[in-house]
Structures are given as C-alpha cells and as structure tokens.
C-alpha cells in the first residue's frame, strides 16, 4: 500500500427512513436549511484524499437527490437494492472499474462526518485493511429476554458503538460482499459484519460522538435547535431595482412570465422583483451587488433568466454555512396588478430559493400616479432579506 492510497467513497442513500416520521426519506429532509444528504456528502466530495464519491440512491428519489446535492462533485448515482447490504454491493460494483485501493462506506443519515474522521478512516484501512470508527459506551447496557426482563448486564468496558465511514481495502470487501450474496446471506446490517463473516480481522479507530445517525423525529428536532443556535449572526440587507418599459407583450416579475401590453428594456430578462432580492441577499452578506457579480456589459447575461441570479445569491449564503430566514419584495407599479399574482409569486420565489413559502412575502403598492411608475413608464421593486450565519465567520464572538 502506498503512502497515498487511491480512495473512493460510497454514500448509501437508498433507504426510506420511516422512523424519522413524515416528510419523505430522512436523507432529503433539511437541517438548518440544508439537506441531510448534502451535509453527509460534501466532506467526502471536498476531501483531498478521496478521488471519487459514489452515491447509491433509490431510483424513485432521482429528482430529490439531484436538487439536494446540486453543486457537489460525484459520480453518477446508481440504484440501490432491497437491503442496505444490496445497496452497498451495487456501489462497490460501480466502483470496480476504478480499482481504488481503499473504499469508505458511509451512511447518508450520518450528516456530521468531519474531514478529520475521513482522514482517520483512510489511515486505518491503509494500515489494517478493514476498520471502523467506534465510540465508547457511556451508559449501562441491559440485555433483556423476549418478555422484556433483564437477562444480563454486559461489561460496558468492552462495548463500542459502531459508526461510519467504515473503511476497507477495496478488493477484500468487494470479494466479501460477492461471497455473501452468492451464499444467500442478506441479513448483515453493516459492512464490518460482512468482513468478520468473511474471516477478516476488523480493527477500530477513534470515532466522533457528534457523528450520530439521524433516525427519529426527536433527532431532527434536537439537531435543528443546535444548528440554529449556532447560526446566531443575524443580518439584514435591502435591495432596489427598476426597469423601463419597451416593446413586448410580457414582463418577468418574481419569476413569473406575466402578460402585459409592453415588455422591459433590460440586458437580462429584467425581473425587477428577483433583482431586488438578489441585491438584498448580497447586501446582507456585504458581498457587493448584482451588477458586480453579473455585469450588464457581459454578453453572457444577455437575456438571462433572473432565477439564475437568485440561486447564485442563495449559494453564496450556503457557502458561508448560513441560511436565509426571510425574504420580502414590494412591487411598485400601476399595472400589471400584482394582487392576483401574489401567491404564485411567493411560491415561485420559494421554489427558486428553497426558502419555505411561509418565509416569503410579496407586496405591492402604487406611487399614486406620481413619478415614472405613476406614468406607467416602468416598474420598480424594493426588497429585504434576513439571513443567519454562524458565529465567528468574521471573527466575531458568539
């Protein structure tokens, strides 16, 4: 084995997560505004020691998966099987063409994995060939019989809680999985157990107490509260945009194509509502304005759809570990009338940003026939955005 083994990772995300309650598969639910699976995958996708990340998903979840992990770098997902064991084997077979030295197998529901834990996994597998992260048992454990009566009290000094990523030499764990499948064994709950069954010695290395598996509604409630408490740096920004009317038969407003007697004079699609929101978000980040990120002199933005700009602004918040808490936009115009479109506009902004519609407000007013909007020469919009960033991002104490 070389000092720098060629390492790949499998992210197991084909389960349904029924114990987590309503809301769909748990790996696609959000924590502090970010999908669990994105939190679980990103440390592998960005780790310098991991050359490839292979997701294994349920084919029914393709749309959710693509939306949740947009922007990350990974191999095309493969479909999972009826059991976790079958899903892992599908991931291993998909990686066989790469012939990695080491493979890390990680559950998507463990979304607090750290780069340090990944590095320890790679080192352990390189040294022993098969290893898993563990943490000590701190509670007293009781073994009970079928009636629920205590049958024994094991010595917790020798007990450990298994975690992922579990790490193996690729060739040996692929062989073990193939042998188990051909032997009709499909009841293993983790990959270390398959390695043990195949006669391999499995070593352990230091896990991480925070590397918990999201399983129950209580897990989600607790971790949501913890993460939101850490996002205590609350910031606000405001934005303003205006566009004059020109020739055309429609205008774009808050992501909707609205029939109108005139169009906008604009370099992009001229959506004043979304442009104002972009400026508000960038202002909250102290990150310039829409013109500095998307110069009107740049031909690539000619006729561009403004939802791209808004998604970009949201990504800037996410990249700093934050989330958007509230968005508000006020349209200033005589026509078209905004009232009948208000709910559809709110829904469209929510779709673009991933912000719950209950945190998106669209309002409208006129200038009482005064000024350019009163003369129906164009439309203006103002916006505000409230975001939450982690304490310490700019050297401030929490």
From Swiss-Prot:
This protein's name: Bifunctional enzyme IspD/IspF
UniProt site positions, description: Transition state stabilizer: 19, 26, 267, 366
Species in which this protein is naturally found: Rhodopseudomonas palustris (strain TIE-1)
Pathway: Isoprenoid biosynthesis; isopentenyl diphosphate biosynthesis via DXP pathway; isopentenyl diphosphate from 1-deoxy-D-xylulose 5-phosphate: step 2/6; Isoprenoid biosynthesis; isopentenyl diphosphate biosynthesis via DXP pathway; isopentenyl diphosphate from 1-deoxy-D-xylulose 5-phosphate: step 4/6
Location of region: 2-C-methyl-D-erythritol 2,4-cyclodiphosphate synthase: 235-398
Upper classification of the organism: Bacteria, Pseudomonadati, Pseudomonadota, Alphaproteobacteria, Hyphomicrobiales
Binding site for a divalent metal cation: 241, 243, 275
Database matches in InterPro entries: IspD (IPR001228), IspD/F (IPR026596), IspD/TarI (IPR034683), ISPD_synthase_CS (IPR018294), MECDP_synthase (IPR003526), MECDP_synthase_CS (IPR020555), MECDP_synthase_sf (IPR036571), Nucleotide-diphossugar_trans (IPR029044)
Keywords: Isoprene biosynthesis, Lyase, Metal-binding, Multifunctional enzyme, Nucleotidyltransferase, Transferase
Cystines in this chain: none
A Pfam match: IspD
Reaction equation(s) it catalyzes: 2-C-methyl-D-erythritol 4-phosphate + CTP + H(+) = 4-CDP-2-C-methyl-D-erythritol + diphosphate; 4-CDP-2-C-methyl-D-erythritol 2-phosphate = 2-C-methyl-D-erythritol 2,4-cyclic diphosphate + CMP
PROSITE patterns, per the entry: ISPD, ISPF
């Amino acid at each position: 084995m070389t000092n720098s083994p060629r390492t790949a990772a499998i992210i197991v995300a084909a389960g349904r997560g029924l114990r987590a309650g309503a809301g769909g598969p748990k790996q696609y639910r959000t924590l502090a505004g970010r999908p669990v699976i994105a939190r679980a995958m990103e440390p592998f996708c960005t780790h310098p020691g991991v050359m490839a990340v292979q997701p294994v998903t349920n084919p029914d979840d393709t749309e959710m998966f693509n939306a949740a992990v947009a922007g990350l770098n990974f191999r095309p997902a493969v479909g999972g099987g009826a059991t976790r064991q079958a899903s892992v084997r599908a991931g291993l077979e998909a990686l066989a063409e790469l012939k990695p030295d080491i493979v890390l197998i990680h559950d998507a529901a463990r979304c607090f994995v750290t780069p340090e834990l990944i590095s320890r996994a790679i080192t352990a597998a390189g040294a022993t060939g098969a290893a898993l992260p563990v943490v000590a048992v701190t509670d007293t454990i009781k073994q009970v019989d079928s009636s629920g009566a205590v049958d024994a009290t094991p010595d917790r000094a020798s007990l450990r809680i298994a975690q992922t990523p579990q790490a193996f030499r690729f060739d040996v764990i692929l062989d073990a999985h193939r042998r188990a499948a051909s032997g009709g064994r499909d009841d293993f709950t983790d990959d270390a157990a398959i390695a043990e069954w195949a006669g391999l010695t499995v070593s352990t290395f230091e896990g991480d107490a925070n590397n918990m598996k999201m399983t129950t509604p209580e897990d989600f409630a607790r971790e949501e509260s913890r993460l939101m408490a850490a996002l205590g740096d609350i910031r606000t920004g405001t934005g303003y945009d205006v566009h004059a009317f020109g020739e055309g038969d429609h205008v774009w407003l808050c992501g909707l194509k609205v029939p109108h007697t005139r169009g906008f004079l604009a370099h992009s699609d001229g959506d004043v509502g979304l442009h104002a929101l972009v400026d508000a978000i960038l202002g909250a980040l102290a990150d310039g304005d829409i013109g500095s990120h998307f110069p009107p002199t740049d031909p690539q933005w000619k006729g561009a759809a403004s939802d791209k700009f808004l998604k970009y602004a949201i990504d800037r918040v996410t990249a700093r570990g934050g989330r958007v808490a509230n968005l508000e936009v006020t349209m200033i115009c005589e026509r078209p009338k905004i009232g009948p479109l208000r709910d559809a506009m709110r829904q469209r902004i929510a779709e673009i940003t991933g912000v719950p519609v209950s945190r998106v407000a669209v309002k409208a007013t006129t200038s009482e026939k005064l000024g350019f909007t009163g003369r129906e020469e164009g439309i203006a919009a103002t916006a505000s955005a409230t975001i939450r960033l982690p304490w310490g991002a700019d050297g401030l104490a929490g």
